[in-house]
């Protein structure tokens, strides 16, 4: 027996399909609008070689975080030099390929991935064991992957000892836990070469909260936040003025005394190490050493 369904009975279904189609059209339009907006407003650094290499490697440093906005001007002077670069948190080593291509004269590139440094099979290994990838990036740029825990002081010290330090660039893209970021900086920054750069990515975790509670036990006004802690580096750099006549005193451990500059950017902090002779400006005795005034027996300072 054939059932005849009146046309009006199909109306809700037809309307529902129309709504779905309309939503899909809106989503497609919004997606196209977002793509167009990205093309129109993307910074000029999106056209840089570094951005392209990181994007092609699948690294979110380019297309999501946009760190290349800052890295291009910082790293471009290093391109042809025999630099030593370390990246912490390399996952499967995707960005390692980009660094090798971007720094063709690099002395050595090191990656640190999470793992047990002491376990069997966790010994340092070549970044690209397969012949195809090795041929693509070139055999002239040594690249070694280590496995270890950046919350372990012992591992960080062992890594510096094994590699010899003297790093020109260190990039912390590891656990993003603020206490790990601070420990890693304090163990590796002494191994950075004079004039070298140290970048801490994903400082967003110092702002995270869940149900009005800091997710990592920190808060922005808590000094254990990496953002709040690094704000104090400005005081360490300017310790000549902060401490009146007590040149050489600093509000932070001595490792911070060798910081020349610090840059705060979107989701990123970059520090540069002093060159030889720079410390004399921060460590000298301030000429206006008593509350900003000259000593009584002097008419000028």
Residue ranges and their predicted role:
Residues 2-169, 175-200, 204-301:
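A short alpha-helical cap/connector motif
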